[in-house]
Structures are given as C-alpha cells and as structure tokens.
Amino acid sequence: MYPQFRRGHLAAAVLFASSSLLGGQALAEDERLEELDERAESVVQLGDEVVLGTAEQELKQAPGVSIITAEDIRKRPPVNDLSEIIRTMPGVNLTGNSSSGQRGNNRQIDIRGMGPENTLILVDGKPVSSRNSVRYGWRGERDTRGDSNWVPPEEVERIEVLRGPAAARYGSGAAGGVVNIITKRPTDRLRGSMTVFTNIPESSKDGATRRANFSLSGPLTEALSFRAYGSANKTDSDDTDINLGHTVNPSRTVAGREGVRNRDLSGMLSWQVTPDQVVDFEAGFSRQGNIYAGDTQNNNGTANTQGLADDGAETNRMYRENYAITHNGTWSFGTSRFVAQYDSTRNNRLEEGLAGSVEGQIGADRSFSASKLENYRLSGELNLPLHALFEQVLTVGAEWNKETLNDPSSLKQGFVGSDSLPGTPAAGSRSPKSKAEIRALYVEDNIELRPGTMLTPGLRLDDHSDFGLNWSPSLNASQTLGEYFTVKAGIARAFKAPNLYQSNPNYLLYTRGNGCPIQTSSGGCYLVGNENLDAETSVNKELGIEFRRDGWVAGLTYFRNDYKNKIVAPLDVMGQTGTGNNILQWSNAKKAVVEGLEGNLLVPLHEDLSWSTNLTYMLQSKDKDTGNPLSVIPEYTLNSTLDWQASERLSTQLTSTIYGRQEPPKHGTSRNTPVVSRKEVGTYGIWGVSAGYTFSENLSVRGGVSNLFDKRLYRQGNSFDAGAATYNEPGRAYYVSMTTSF
C-alpha cells in the first residue's frame, strides 16, 4: 500500500498553518485535522522504522509552495476553470504567453512572470499538455485556454502550486512552476454525490454558467475499489458588442470572452495486491468546445467571423483521452512508484490563415482541420532511507516521454512567387508529422544534518532526441532559528525544450511587410522553424523567512529567475530570398530577468475566525534585448480572505484581490507598430462574499456574490494600440451550488 504516514496532530497542525498561510484560505475547525492528516507526509513510516520524508515531500515545504484544499474550493467554487482559484496563490496570475495582447481573453496560469508556457500542469502527478496541439503563433500565443480545466472542481482533493527551485525537479516546462491537481481517491465505503452550480451575471452581456457533476466511489471486493465521475459544464460567450465604445480603434473588432462546453468522464480501479502493493488503473475522456465570441488574432473581424459569433458557433473542439497504470509499493528497503501513461488530444477547429494580418483569422469556407497530439510516458522512482553519517532519504528516478504531433493545416503556408527556402519543402511536399523524445535520470537526497537543519541537493539529466543533454542541478536548505523562525533557501537550474512548432523546419509563417521586424525596411518576411535551437534555461533562486507562534504565521520570500535562451521570433534577418523577401528563423534570445517578493500573513482573530493574506510584488520582469516584459502582469497582487465558521453548520467568507498597475510593452518590434501604446491598466480591486449551510450530512448549499462592487474592465485591443488593456474583467455575478450525497 502507500507509504504509511505518521498522523500526529502536531504534524497536521504545522501543515494547516502552512496551507492556510500560503493558500490564503482557512478551513473549518471541525474539518481541519481530518483533511490535513491525509497530507502529513513530513515523516514516513516503514513498518516499525520511522525515517525522514523524501526530497519531494521536503521540497513541498519550501517557501515557493502553496496548497489549495478541497474545502478551499468548496468555499470559493470556480465558475468554470480551476485557474480562477489557483490565481489567488502567491506568485500566480492569469495572462498571455507574451506581451502582445493577442488572444487577450484566453488567459492562462502564469507563475512568477515566466509565462504560461513555463507552467507545467499535472493531474495526479502526471503531465497534461493538450495545449501543445494548438498552433504556436508568431508572437508566441496559442488560441487555447490551457490545461487547467480537465478536472471538475468538485473532484479535486487538493492542488499543489510549486514555484521556483522546488519546481525544477519536474523537468522541461517547469521553469516558472508546477500546478499539480490531485483528484479524490476511492473511498472505503460506497459513497456518491451530485453537485449543481450556476453563475448568473448581473449584466446580460456577460456569459452565464451552468455546471453539474456526479461521483461514485467505494469498494468492490476486499482488495478492489473504484472511483468514477462525470461532469457537464456550459459557459455562454459574452455578447458580441460587449466592448463596443471602449476599443481604441473603432474599425477593429475586439471580442469578449468566448464560451465553453465541457464534458468529462473518468474512472479509476484500485487493486490492493498485497498490504504493501497497490496498482491503480485509470481511464478518462474529455471534450472541450468553445462558443465563439468573434475573436481573431489581430482583431480584424469579417462578416464571416461576425456571423459565426452571432450564431454562437463552435469553432474549435478538443477531445482528450488518457490512460495510466500506477504501482505504489512499500518494501523493506524503502518505497517505489512506477507509472505508465498514454494520452492523446484531437484538436478540431475551423481553418485559420497563416499569413500576415489574417494569421489566426477563420477562413470564409468554414472548413474544419484536425491535428493530433500523442504522448507516451514511463516514469519510476525509488525512495531509500539511509543512516550513514546522517539520517537521509535518497531518491533515484527515471523518465521517458515521447511526443508526436500530426498537424497538416498549420504546415500548409506556401511560398510567394518563385521563392524557396533551403531545408523547407514546398507546401504540398511537407510532412505534417513531428516528434521528440526526452529521457531523464534524476537523483535527490533529503539530509538531516542536525535537528532543525535540512539539506536537499538534487541533480537531473535530460537527454532530448534533437537538442541533446541538459543538466539541472538544485540545492535547497532549511534552518530553524530558535523556536519561532525558519530560514529557507533554494537554487536550481530549470529548462524548457523547444516545442514542436518552433523546432520544425516545415512550419512556415509569412507576412507581406507590416508584421516584419522593425529593423527591416522593405520586402515581406518568412518565419521558419529551426532545428538547431538551444533549450531555454533559467537559474531560479529564492530566500525566505517564516515566523510561527500561537497560530500566527508570517513569511517573506525573495525570488529571482535569470532566464536565458528564450525562444522568440527574432528581430534580426538571417538572409533574403531571390525576390527580396526576408528570412527569419525562431531564435534564442540572450537574457531576461524576473525578480520579486512574496509575503504571507495568517492571523487567528478568534477560534472560529481567521484572516489570511498573501502579496506578490514584482520588482522587474523584462527581456534584456527588447526591454519589454515577458508577459503583462500586475506590479503587485494582494489576496485576502476573512473566514468565519459562524456555527457548526454555517460558514461565511469575505475575499478581496487588489491588482496593482499593469504596464504595457515599452518598445514596438514590428514594422507597422514602431511606436506602441503606453496605456496602463490602473490599480483595481475585486471583492466577493459567500455563505454556506450544511443542512445534513447529505445536503449542503453555498451561495455568493463575486465582484461585489461591479468593477469592470473592457478589452480595448492588442498591446500595440491598447497597451495593457487587452482583456475583459467580468462584472458582478451571483452564484449558488448545491451538493447532495449518500
């Protein structure tokens, strides 16, 4: 079975303080210990022997780690996407992958300003990367909502958000951080539940939401148990004229938020082969479709896109299948975990242009194209308690991942006239397929040098089939200072391999001139994939101090990421065709830097009343080549929660989020936008209030008001003409959820 954990209330209380502080949420007193005992993993017990926790468990106590519990989600239910509650964690915002403002309402999870492409999403520790099936645009954006909406909120046991050095152990794509969504496991007796949720905006121009889900779980035999859940969710799109009168350029069509139609079905069969061996079999199917609101990449809508929006058409849909077998074992020498995983994503969408101003614009013929992304993954690790010199737990592990992509539509951009490019065949002769493999070995050691002094060194080696070896060393340390203070520090080298569009010489984009780099004076431009790229790397550092006494918890963490080789569409031309068109390749930029502070405060005002706050303050975030930010995020973000357990049955919560000013890019990078708008988004706040009542063990209701003071933002364009005003903030809305169970 799983490693047995010492379930002392002291360990649980420490974890409670950490989760309340870092997550900005408070749990009801009568549920705290029961829920958090499940996570008291700081001490592992093998038979009668008590040993230290693993390196992974120790790193989850680092300054850059937050926990969102099922109770947090129940008290603050997301309207549609888990990213809505994840964004309330320190260091987390929602934004695009660049400062362009394109697809401005498709905001994804950004951790410490490193952009969504540097945020790795896991479900039960397994990578989820369906967004990689969506074409990667010239400015670094994808027309996707990301990978944070594959699990219904009601089926989440907890969410772990890892930032900085603690995330580097997870390999490619985790340079910003990791979001690990842990689902609920099979129960020890037959249980079932059903939840319905509705969110009704006060303004008829904002899209409403209806959601329903069920779950069923329990034993089948003494050794066999199961869990199954399903959900259906619909969020309407915003009205097509929601931004009318607010756009900087009235001739442009600036769309609101698109709607979604989601369906999820998942099952798990858990087999306890022996008291010390458990094998889980998992399978799931999800369908995500949009309800089109009229968005185009360059806000240049047509009669065709307007008609699709008026009809509420579904212009893209994604089908995801996932299968996994997981073995967890406890042995006389330690513990083990092995995972075999396969997932595929079919991405069906109306075909879009690939050239110039019509890049990302749906074609008039309304024909669907399809791409298919497949991932094959194997991983395994051993945790070995050792007693030589110091008490320690050594972790050794290996991973293998093969990613394949078949995307004919995105590779069909042709040459102009008699142009040709070395290494890039004509459109009809290109293979639509690309692939990559990564093999990895890693070793970590969690060492107790002396009571109160922990040292966790690690080393990871990744071997990419196209880009060779990458070493990722790490070192984390923790030192208690007396009874109340703890200092924690970490440094790690993280990396991200080029994606299957950036590295594919068959992937070609074209602009007749306006979208060319600002340094060019004439001719059109081709942007082509580059199979000689280097991996992106980042040296992530953090230093934090924590104070704990009598229920009070306070912390302050400094972080800095020195980012190298970010892959971008370059400003420099590598050559010209015979007709005078410019040739560019995806290239590695030189350096960028992200730096900031994270602060936390938990105040136990009363036995049943707590106040928790977290603050993120960005000192700098910029590409040193262009001076532009890596992504547009607030100067600071303040999340605060006042949680009152009024009675055994009644709980209430008051929440607020204050966003500091958001600065746009400072410098234009393309020929048609040598000067960009300097319009900022000023400081604003979003408040919410909710209350929940438990009628019985089998029936509970919760309702609330979001955006209590109706603070709205309107999308005004892309960054070159609207600065930072590139997204909609919806207005006041009323929600209610009801859960019945047996």
Swiss-Prot record:
Can you give the residue ranges of the TBDR plug domain?
57-184
Q: Does the keyword Glycosyltransferase apply?
A: no
Q: Which Gene3D superfamilies match?
A: TonB-dependent receptor, beta-barrel domain (2.40.170.20), TonB-dependent receptor, plug domain (2.170.130.10)
Q: Chief localization class? A: membrane
Cysteine disulfide links: C516-C525
Q: Provide the TBDR beta-barrel domain boundaries.
A: 189-742
> What does the record say about the knockout?
Deletion decreases sensitivity to siderophore-beta-lactam drug conjugates. In a pvdD and pchEF double mutant background, in iron restricted culture, able to grow in the presence of enterobactin or various synthetic catecholates, but fails to grow when enterobactin receptor pfeA is also deleted. In a pvdF and pchA double mutant background, in iron restricted culture, growth inhibited by 60% in the presence of dopamine and delayed in the presence of other catecholamines such as epinephrine; growth is inhibited further, but not completely abolished, when piuA is aso deleted.
User: What are the record keywords, sorted?
Assistant: Cell outer membrane, Disulfide bond, Ion transport, Iron, Iron transport, Membrane, Porin, Receptor, Signal, TonB box, Transmembrane, Transmembrane beta strand, Transport
Q: Does the keyword Transmembrane helix apply?
A: no
The record ties this protein, via CDD domains, to:
ligand_gated_channel (cd01347)
Signal peptide as annotated in the record: 1-28
Topology of the protein relative to the lipid bilayer: Multi-pass membrane protein
The record's subcellular location field reads: Cell outer membrane
Q: Can you name this protein? A: Ferric enterobactin receptor PirA
The species this protein was found in: Pseudomonas aeruginosa (strain ATCC 15692 / DSM 22644 / CIP 104116 / JCM 14847 / LMG 12228 / 1C / PRS 101 / PAO1)
